[in-house]
Amino acid sequence: METKNAKAIARKVSIAPRKARLVVDLIRGKNIAQAQAILTFTPKVAAPVILKLLNSAVSNAVNNLKLNREQLYVKEVFVNEGFRLKRMFPRAKG
């Protein structure tokens, strides 16, 4: 039987990847109810963003793939580095 995977992607989130990885490592491998409870009570800046992303992935699984919500778990979650803003410090360079 083929396993079905639902995914969600958050782009252009202005949180440091190192800080977001601390939160993501807490929910890897957990079922959805546990992951949502962990993210709700985690006092980190990245927690609400990752909770919103998790809820989006759950909605994709339930609505698009017709999967049972109670059987869902976090199979894979990762954080990569996004774009950087180019800054300039105006100063004489000669």
Curated annotation (Swiss-Prot):
One of its GO terms (biological process) is translation. CDD domains: Ribosomal_L22. One of its GO terms (molecular function) is structural constituent of ribosome. SUPFAM superfamilies: Ribosomal protein L22. Pfam families: Ribosomal_L22. It comes from the Bacteria. InterPro entries: Ribosomal_uL22, Ribosomal_uL22_bac/chlpt-type, Ribosomal_uL22_bac/org-type, Ribosomal_uL22_sf. Keywords: Ribonucleoprotein, Ribosomal protein, RNA-binding, rRNA-binding. Disulfide bonds: none annotated. One of its GO terms (cellular component) is cytosolic large ribosomal subunit. NCBIfam families: rplV_bact. This protein binds specifically to 23S rRNA; its binding is stimulated by other ribosomal proteins, e.g. L4, L17, and L20. It is important during the early stages of 50S assembly. It makes multiple contacts with different domains of the 23S rRNA in the assembled 50S subunit and ribosome. Belongs to the universal ribosomal protein uL22 family. Part of the 50S ribosomal subunit. PANTHER family: CHLOROPLAST 50S RIBOSOMAL PROTEIN L22-RELATED, LARGE RIBOSOMAL SUBUNIT PROTEIN UL22M. This is Large ribosomal subunit protein uL22.
